[in-house]
């Protein structure tokens, strides 16, 4: 069977170490050659590519990327595809198409679905379905505790970092410090990243009615507000809340 060759030329190639004009040769869906330097037309592109890669024969497809930047695909470490159980919001197909359209080749999906992704079995099923769509690679996180209940970390004890590089309780915190420590130890022994939502849920709940009251006042009376600085002793940072509902924040 003939190989499918794509030659992308006249692009600006950008990664962590370069920002130069050049061309890229793709064979059967995989990059097999990168050449730096200005290449103005398809004839020049073919001469350069075939002189170094003699396997380039036949009629390759040429793409003139003039005015475009060519970069490696991006990685999004926190996405919500809402699958399974919340597909009225998003699903694998729409999420993966959006990722591919935005240049994201790898995404890490959160476990707050219905049911919660608390087992390797369910996570593998989701990743298998995603891979069949051939749009972007999905790493499905497993919840730190079973069903977000904050008690049982048995499901993460034997995960492999190759399959599950990240675990997360997503938009909540494991309140019990002993349970969180056990979960971190389980992840640490396998070099798995623990993505934490560092927020005391009791303090967050207490603040909610006051936040809602302020937003309602701003919305009803068209009152603008500036930045709200949230400062702790060790994290002198600010959070910029922008356009919550119809309030101008």
Spans of model-derived segments:
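Metal-associated gating/positioning segment near the N- to mid-region
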Residues: 56, 65-130
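Divalent metal-dependent hydrolysis catalytic cores, especially in the metallo-beta-lactamase
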Residues: 93-117, 134-146, 160-175, 191-199, ...
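N-terminal metal-binding scaffold of metallo-dependent hydrolase/deaminase domains
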Residues: 1-55
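Acidic (Asp/Glu)-rich catalytic clusters
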Residues: 127-133, 156-161
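Active-site gating loops and adjacent loop-to-helix segments of metal-dependent hydrolytic enzymes
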Residues: 102-104, 128-137, 201-246
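Active-site-adjacent beta->alpha loops and helix N-cap segments on the catalytic face
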Residues: 116-126, 173-186
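Divalent metal-coordination and catalytic microenvironments
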Residues: 11, 24, 29, 67, ...
């Amino acid at each position: 069977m003939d190989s499918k060759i794509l030659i992308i030329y006249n692009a600006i190639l950008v990664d962590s170490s370069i920002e130069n004009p050049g061309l890229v040769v793709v064979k059967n869906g995989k990059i097999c050659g990168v050449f730096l330097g200005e290449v103005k037309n398809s004839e020049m592109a073919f001469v350069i590519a075939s002189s170094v890669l003699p396997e380039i024969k036949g009629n390759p497809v040429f793409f003139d990327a003039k005015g475009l930047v060519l970069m490696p695909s991006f990685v999004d470490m926190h996405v919500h595809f809402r699958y399974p159980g919340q597909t009225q919001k998003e699903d694998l197909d729409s999420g993966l198409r959006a990722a591919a359209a935005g240049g994201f080749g790898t995404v890490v999906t959160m476990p707050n679905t219905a049911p919660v992704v608390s087992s390797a079995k369910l996570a593998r099923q989701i990743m298998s379905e995603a891979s069949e769509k051939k749009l972007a690679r999905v790493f499905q996180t497993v919840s730190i505790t079973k069903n977000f209940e904050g008690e049982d970390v048995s499901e993460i004890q034997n995960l492999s970092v190759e399959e599950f590089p990240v675990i997360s309780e997503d938009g909540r915190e494991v309140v019990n410090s002993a349970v969180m420590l056990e979960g971190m130890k389980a992840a640490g022994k396998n070099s798995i990243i623990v993505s934490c939502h560092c927020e005391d849920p009791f303090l967050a709940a207490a603040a909610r009615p006051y936040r809602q009251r302020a937003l309602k006042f701003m919305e009803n009376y068209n009152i603008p507000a500036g930045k709200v600085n949230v400062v702790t002793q060790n994290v002198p940072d600010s959070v910029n809340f922008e356009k919550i509902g119809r309030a101008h924040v």
